[in-house]
């Protein structure tokens, strides 16, 4: 049962439930004791000149069903949560049942994962069964953000290339899946200088990747880029140690528009990948990490 703001609401709901059950029982008893009238046994209402409503008591089988329903409700509310904040004698919760089912499923799958957990990513990438399991894990847990083809979208990284903010080794990928990542670029406008300086730095950043830019503005922004170099490096190639982006390639996680660069410098950006350790076992993460690693390796081989 969901938590209430205070115990008063719990008592209120529980009271209504108990009163309703008692009311049903009283109505059933009163209706069952009604006797058939000796004369015409009608309610006295007449429709269409001669259509009358009989006033017979409830059939015994129907009254029996009502009694069974009330008894079931009493037993259910005693065993399971449903009477206000009362947890029931079985202390059952849907969360607990789900956790138990997950543990049971993991125990059943443990022998299957046991043969994979000691293998490196290179070996798993060549194992069709391991890759099939990894693909299903990806579809259930990763595709919602990164896409069914793992190519991502604006704000969600493409996992099939070799542009890794935090590293693309199997161990780094597992680390990312397990603990998640928080990418945080603070607003830098104040550190860069004037609004014109922000525009110039944006032009310089565009020039690093060979994107269309204003050459004069880019040269003016080069000196101001020094405040960005603390994270992105003096050459703009980024640093995986802090998860900063490589500004010299043609991969732009949040888009390439010039105005977009202005916004990033002015407002900063926070991107979060949630941790999956609570959803996946270490063995599952090992296989899933190998599958994700294989996606970029396939892309690299194809590019060659």
UniProtKB/Swiss-Prot annotation:
Please state where this protein is localized: Cell inner membrane
Q: Where does heme c 2 bind?
A: 185, 228, 231-232
UniProt pathway annotation? Energy metabolism; oxidative phosphorylation
List GO BP terms, alphabetically: oxidative phosphorylation; proton transmembrane transport
Q: Recall the taxonomic lineage recorded for the source organism.
A: Bacteria, Pseudomonadati, Pseudomonadota, Betaproteobacteria, Burkholderiales
Please give an example of a GO cellular component term from this record: plasma membrane
Residue ranges of every copy of the Cytochrome c domain listed in the record: 129-209, 216-296
Indicate yes or no for the key word ATP-binding. Answer: no
Q: Which family does it belong to?
A: Belongs to the CcoP / FixP family.
- Membrane topology qualifier: Multi-pass membrane protein
Give binding positions for heme c 1.
142, 145-146, 273
User: What does the note under cofactor report?
Assistant: Binds 2 heme C groups per subunit.
Task: Report the gene name.
Answer: ccoP
Amino-acid biosynthesis recorded as keyword: no
Any one GO MF term held by the record is: electron transfer activity
Binding partners and assembly: Component of the cbb3-type cytochrome c oxidase at least composed of CcoN, CcoO, CcoQ and CcoP.
Membrane spanning stretches: 11-31, 61-81
Cofactors named for this entry: heme c
Q: What name is this protein filed under?
A: Cbb3-type cytochrome c oxidase subunit CcoP
Q: Which organism is it from?
A: Rubrivivax gelatinosus (Rhodocyclus gelatinosus)
Q: Which UniProt keywords apply?
A: Cell inner membrane, Cell membrane, Electron transport, Heme, Hydrogen ion transport, Ion transport, Iron, Membrane, Metal-binding, Oxidoreductase, Repeat, Respiratory chain, Transmembrane, Transmembrane helix, Transport
Q: What does this protein do?
A: C-type cytochrome. Part of the cbb3-type cytochrome c oxidase complex. CcoP subunit is required for transferring electrons from donor cytochrome c via its heme groups to CcoO subunit. From there, electrons are shuttled to the catalytic binuclear center of CcoN subunit where oxygen reduction takes place. The complex also functions as a proton pump.
């Amino acid at each position: 049962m969901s938590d209430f703001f205070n115990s008063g609401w719990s008592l209120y709901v529980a009271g209504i439930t108990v009163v309703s059950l008692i009311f049903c029982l009283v109505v059933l008893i009163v209706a069952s004791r009604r006797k058939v009238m000796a004369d015409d046994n009608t309610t006295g209402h007449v429709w269409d000149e001669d259509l009358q409503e009989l006033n017979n008591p409830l059939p015994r089988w129907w009254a029996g069903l009502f009694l069974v329903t009330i008894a079931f409700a009493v037993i259910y509310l005693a065993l399971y949560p449903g009477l206000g904040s009362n947890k029931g004698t079985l202390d059952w919760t849907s969360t607990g049942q789900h956790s138990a089912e997950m543990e049971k499923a993991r125990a059943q799958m443990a022998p299957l994962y046991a043969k994979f957990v000691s293998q490196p990513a290179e070996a798993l990438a060549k194992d069709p069964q391991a890759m099939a399991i990894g693909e299903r894990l990806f579809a259930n847990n990763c595709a919602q953000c990164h896409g069914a083809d793992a190519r991502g979208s604006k704000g969600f990284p493409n996992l099939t290339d070799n542009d890794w903010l935090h590293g693309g080794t199997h161990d780094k990928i597992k680390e990312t899946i397990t603990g998640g990542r928080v990418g945080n670029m603070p607003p830098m406008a104040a550190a860069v200088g004037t609004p014109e300086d922000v525009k110039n730095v944006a032009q310089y950043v565009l020039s690093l990747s060979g994107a269309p830019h204003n050459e004069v503005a880019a040269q003016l922004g080069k000196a101001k880029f020094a405040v960005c170099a603390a994270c992105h490096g003096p050459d703009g190639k980024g640093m995986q140690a802090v998860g900063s982006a490589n500004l010299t390639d043609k991969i732009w996680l949040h888009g390439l528009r010039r105005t977009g660069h202005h916004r990033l410098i002015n407002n900063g950006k926070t991107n979060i990948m949630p941790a999956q350790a609570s959803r996946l076992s270490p063995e599952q993460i090992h296989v899933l990490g190998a599958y994700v690693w294989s996606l970029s390796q396939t892309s690299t081989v194809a590019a060659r």
